[in-house]
């Protein structure tokens, strides 16, 4: 829902197209709940992002209990909300949110994955994790159990910030340095997304690829009542 400053990437898992069902349920449910909450304060929005992801989780999990062909389905969910001059991210799984600011490419989220846990424990390097046979094993997702707790991140937007939300179909094929180079090149969000998808496919394109790029062209100074506005071009694929 770009006109409301709401962006969601969900990457489903499960056989017989169940993953697509899970990801669609997550996107629709989260978008519905957060669009209805438009106009809430930042503090209220934090709670509503958490509630929206947990609600989507419950709906997906309940469906797995009554439809045998949907058992085991689930999805990642990475949500970006632009709220005045602030951004808010809700995150479950191994899709990622990045921020390119002043030429520096930051990964804002941390993967909920087996290999990330091994990296955190010092058993694997990030380079080893990329090619590990269990690199696609996630430890937290939406719909796998009765409840889920999302990670929440927030910060202040600046003019010329560029956000990237992406599934592991992109980040597993294209290294961060290459993604950053694409975003630093001349172009628009639409062209950057096209280049990223083309590069992932050129390298083998082993998984579904989902990417959203959001560029903050302008962040107005807060008005006396605290309201700010933004010009936010976005592209997704």
Locations of regions flagged by a protein language model:
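PP2C/PPM-type serine/threonine phosphatase catalytic domain
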Residues: 1-237
């Amino acid at each position: 829902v770009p006109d409301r400053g709401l962006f969601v990437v969900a990457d489903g898992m499960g056989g017989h197209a169940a993953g697509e069902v899970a990801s669609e349920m997550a996107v629709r449910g989260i978008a519905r709940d957060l669009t209805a909450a438009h106009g809430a304060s930042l503090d209220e929005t934090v709670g509503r992002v958490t509630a929206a992801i947990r609600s989507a989780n419950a709906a997906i999990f309940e469906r797995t209990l009554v439809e045998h062909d949907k058992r085991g389905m689930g999805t990642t969910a990475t949500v970006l909300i632009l709220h005045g001059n602030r951004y808010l991210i809700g995150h479950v799984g191994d899709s990622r949110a990045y921020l390119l600011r002043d030429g520096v490419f930051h990964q804002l989220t941390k993967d909920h994955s087996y290999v990330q846990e091994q990296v955190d424990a010092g058993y694997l390097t990030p380079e080893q994790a990329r090619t590990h046979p269990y690199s696609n094993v996630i430890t937290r997702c939406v719909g796998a159990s009765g409840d889920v707790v999302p990670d929440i991140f927030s910060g202040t937007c600046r003019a010329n910030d560029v956000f990237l939300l992406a599934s592991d179909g992109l980040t597993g094929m294209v290294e961060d340095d290459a993604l950053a180079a694409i975003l630093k090149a001349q172009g628009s969000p639409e062209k950057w997304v096209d280049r990223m998808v083309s590069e992932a496919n050129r390298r083998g394109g082993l998984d579904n690829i989902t990417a959203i790029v959001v560029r903050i062209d302008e962040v107005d100074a807060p008005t006396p009542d605290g309201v700010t506005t933004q010009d936010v071009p976005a592209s997704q694929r």
